[in-house]
């Protein structure tokens, strides 16, 4: 089976919080979950279902009798090299269908698949020195010749969907996308704001205390 992974070649997980004592870690997670804050600080994988999607669905259920503009927003803090594209597309579907506002906050590195999640936030914030990466990812396939051909044909459809999402969610046009798609295109938050990737830069357009 083919594995479609979108991470830069230097990809690492950022699970440093797990090195804390269990009690401290659990206390921090509960504190932020109670504030409807989700933390993406590792590679994107199948755990998005129980870690993020289920919570977004639950909060939408809790809010079903509240007008969308009166609901407590959900905030997703993102510091990730990216990861599995199938899991990424599923989480994007959940975010897009959420009637409860979902705010994404870029911090550190927002790369590849994590970048696609970020741009689908209803309101997109970033710290000044947040680094974004848009690229074509990495494909790992170990299968028969015919199955590889089948997957590559399907991969073209995936690329079309990714392109359409970027063109829809940002100010990036088709020409600029085509010129940068097969490159490792890194940029900071100020360039992201110019490209329509970032809505607000923390410390310039919004204060940190106003996010939560």
Identify what each model region corresponds to.
Residues 1-212:
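Terminal-region recognition feature
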